[in-house]
C-alpha cells in the first residue's frame, strides 16, 4: 500500500522555546537572578548578609562582619581592578550614602559573579523563563499530553540548571585589606576564587575563615603581638596629653 504522510503546521515545542527565550527582556533575566539570590541565608561568621544592594546606603556601617552579594550586573574578571564589581565594592567600602564616609571599612567582604559565567547563566535563565511561559500558556498553545510532560520535565531541569550555574557564577570573593608594612592608609584587595557545590554564602564563609579575612576569635597573645607591631614599631613610648581642667 502507498504510505501517507502528514505535516503539523504548528511550530515544534523546542522552536517555540527558542523563539520565546530570544524575546525575554534583560531586566526580567536580572530580576529572576536577584530573586534566587535573595533566598541565600546569613551564616557565621557574618553578622549580616546584604544581597544586591542598590546603593552603599543599603549596607549598615557597624562593628560587625558583613557579606555583600553584588548585583548580577556588577561582574568581575580575573585581574581586572576596574571591573564593575570592583567599582561597586569600592563605593560601598568607602561610603554610606552619598555624603557620609564609611567608618568600619574593615567589616565588609564582597562576592561577585564572573563576567563570562554570568553571560552563560543569563542564557540559562532565558530558557527557564521561556519554559515557564509555555507552561503558563499550555492551554492557549493547545499542548497535547506528550508536550505537557516534556514541558514539565524541561522546566524542572532548567530550574535546577539555573540554581547550579548561579552558585558557580558567584565565584569571586573580594577582600579589602591594608598592608601594615607598606601604607596603612591605602586599601588593597585580594580576589580569590571560591568554588564547590555549596551555597554562595557557605563558600565565602569557609574561604574567609581559611584566609583569616574574618577571625571570629583571637587568642590574647596573638592580639598583643599584633598591637605591639603597630604601637612600638618606631618608638618605645606613647605620648599622653594632659587632661583639660
Could you say what each language-model-derived stretch is?
Residues 1-245:
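Extended alpha-helical scaffold and adjacent linker segments that couple domains
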